[in-house]
Amino acid sequence: MSPAAAPLTLALSKGRIFEETMPLLAEAGIEVPENPESSRKLILPTSDPGLRLIIVRASDVPTYVQYGAADLGIAGKDVLIEHAAQQSGRLYQPIDLNIAKCRLCVAVRQDFDYQAAVHQGARLRVATKYVQSAREHFAAKGVHVDIIKLYGSMELAPLVGLADAIVDLVSTGGTLRANGLAAVEDVMPISSRLIVNQAALKTRGARLQPLIDAFRRASERIA
């Protein structure tokens, strides 16, 4: 099969983004018969023979799209900012799908006076996996910080003295409260966007553009 005739490949991550993408695909008339949560397959067919899904880590979605292993993908704004800080080359982001919404926030122990520390010019240790977003946020506010990169269990860092604060995604705040933390500052609202490989848009645009348009219509109807 020639590359031009091969199915389009959409990169998705498991979990909330996958779940909230399914109604958009359904609105576009595309069904996915297998659920990645129960299937071991990493390449999933769809009801449209011209489209397949690949299941990758959320942080890897932009890389698969940028290097052409996927023609398009869906990734959160948080992931895209971190990817752009580490990789040269820009990804085409035609649509904010307004799915998987949450906030990127600064959070501290409930007994820590964050505002007083900032006002006094204290140098804070901040744990996060969103290094670029955190660095830009604190620089814009003139707050002096040392960034500690972690990959998970962010809430633990202030509890054991590793950090004064964390920057992490927050939906309901339940996990923060359960661990004695509180959000004290919003960094930015987060939602997931459709991203497209720019070379594929040129070479396979006749097939990609209708799918992009279908995503746009579906997101507008569901919003």
Swiss-Prot record:
The keyword Cell inner membrane does not apply. InterPro entries: ATP_PRibTrfase_cat, ATP_PRibTrfase_CS, ATP_PRibTrfase_HisG, ATP_PRibTrfase_HisG_short. Its main location: cytoplasm. One of its GO terms (biological process) is L-histidine biosynthetic process. Pfam families: HisG. GO terms for cellular component: cytoplasm. It is found in: Cytoplasm. Gene3D superfamilies: Periplasmic binding protein-like II. Keywords: Amino-acid biosynthesis, ATP-binding, Cytoplasm, Glycosyltransferase, Histidine biosynthesis, Nucleotide-binding, Transferase. Lacks the C-terminal regulatory region which is replaced by HisZ. Heteromultimer composed of HisG and HisZ subunits. Catalyzes the condensation of ATP and 5-phosphoribose 1-diphosphate to form N'-(5'-phosphoribosyl)-ATP (PR-ATP). Has a crucial role in the pathway because the rate of histidine biosynthesis seems to be controlled primarily by regulation of HisG enzymatic activity. NCBIfam families: hisG. This is ATP phosphoribosyltransferase. The lineage of its organism: Bacteria, Pseudomonadati, Pseudomonadota, Betaproteobacteria, Burkholderiales. The gene is hisG.
